[in-house]
Each structure stands twice: as structure tokens, then as C-alpha cells.
């Protein structure tokens, strides 16, 4: 079993805010810059899940950011543990390509997103993301 050190809330907040800002800016290198070399990325509901390692996560984010324009996040709640943060927010933007098995055609969408970031030594070792796909389907339907 891995031994984790307590990570303070301010450090966890910096990680979450940095990830959100990097996604908003479309900056893949900033996104993966806070991740461990052996990071695991689990996009719940995705066919190719989970992906392992920085190269695979980098490719996934290139694909996601090519299909979406991240415009705004509205915080809902954030929960903390000694080695994780759970962040719930409302994601708003445009789906300009194909994502979640849906074609967006540039339409605006807004949905609930829940992120679980597991952290060791100040780096994200696992990121699990739940997007409210049914809400997205209803908006695009």
C-alpha cells in the first residue's frame, strides 16, 4: 500500500484551480505539468479507460481540447481528504467537435462535472472525471 502524506487544502486548491485554468486556456502542457509520470486518468464512461502515463494523458487532453471550448466553471462544492480533493463544478462551454460520442456542431452546453484528484508528493497520481453525459445529450438532442 502506498504511503501518502497529508496534503493541505491550500495546496489541493492550487492544483484544482491550476487544472481548471489550464483547461480553460487550452494549455495541455500546463495540465500534465502537475501530474506524476505514472498518472492514471479515468474519464468515466469513456471507451478507452483508464489511460496510464503522461503521454497517454497528454493525447487524451489534446483530443478533448480539440473538441471543446472551455468557457466557465461555477464551483458547487469541494471535499478534502489527506491525499485527495473532490471538486464538483458546473462546466460551461461549446462542443465544437465530437466528444462523449456526440457531435456538438459548436453548440453551447453546460453540465455538472465531478473530479477526484488523488495526490502524492504534490503531484496528481490519479484523476477520475465524471461528466453528466445525460445532461449533455438532452442539450444536444
Give the location of each predicted region.
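Short, low-complexity N-terminal intrinsically disordered segments enriched in polar/charged residues
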Residues: 1-37, 140-141
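A solvent-exposed, acidic/Ser-Thr-rich amphipathic alpha-helical stretch
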Residues: 13-14, 28-82
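Hydrophobic pocket/interface hotspot
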Residues: 19, 31-32, 39, 53, ...
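Short beta-strand segments enriched in hydrophobic/aromatic residues
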Residues: 35-36, 91-93, 115, 131
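Short, surface-exposed coil-to-beta transition loops
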Residues: 71-73, 109-114
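A short hydrophobic beta-strand element
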Residues: 83-95
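Short, surface-exposed loop/helix-turn segments at secondary-structure junctions
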Residues: 94-106
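Low-complexity, intrinsically disordered terminal/linker segments enriched in charged
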Residues: 125-141
Amino acid at each position: 500500500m502506498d504511503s501518502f502524506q497529508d496534503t493541505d487544502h491550500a495546496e489541493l486548491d492550487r492544483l484544482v484551480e491550476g487544472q481548471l485554468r489550464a483547461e480553460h486556456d487550452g494549455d495541455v502542457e500546463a495540465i500534465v505539468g502537475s501530474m506524476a509520470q505514472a498518472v492514471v486518468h479515468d474519464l468515466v464512461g469513456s471507451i478507452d479507460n483508464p489511460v496510464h502515463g503522461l503521454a497517454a494523458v497528454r493525447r487524451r487532453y489534446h483530443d478533448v481540447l480539440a473538441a471543446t471550448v472551455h468557457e466557465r466553471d461555477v464551483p458547487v462544492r469541494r471535499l478534502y481528504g489527506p491525499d485527495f480533493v473532490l471538486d464538483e463544478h458546473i462546466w460551461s462551454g461549446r462542443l465544437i467537435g465530437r466528444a462523449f460520442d456526440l457531435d456538438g456542431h459548436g453548440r453551447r452546453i453546460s453540465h455538472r462535472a465531478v473530479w477526484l484528484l488523488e495526490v502524492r508528493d504534490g503531484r496528481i497520481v490519479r484523476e477520475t472525471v465524471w461528466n453528466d453525459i445525460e445532461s449533455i445529450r438532452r442539450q444536444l438532442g
